[in-house]
Amino acid sequence: MKFTVYVKPNSKKVFFRKEEDGVLTIAVREPALEGKANEAVIESISKEMKVPKSKIRILSGQKNKKKIIEIDL
């Protein structure tokens, strides 16, 4: 399964929200430095969707706020 995620790093509030256009918005506290925000996004998706972190990967957008995520089901 593939989907688009918009990430808000360095956020005061942590949330996981589906927008009207179908894009997920994930806010994480970690900064967008050295992949910390990406790790937090994967962990957030893992907890929210109850999927092991090893099954989640970022296909594109490693250094961008807009990412395409793939989950192996």
From Swiss-Prot:
Protein name as annotated: UPF0235 protein LA_1736
Species of origin: Leptospira interrogans serogroup Icterohaemorrhagiae serovar Lai (strain 56601)
Family according to the record: Belongs to the UPF0235 family.
Gene3D superfamilies from the UniProt entry: YggU-like
Stored InterPro entries: DUF167, YggU-like_sf
Superkingdom of origin: Bacteria
Matches recorded under HAMAP family: UPF0235 (MF_00634)
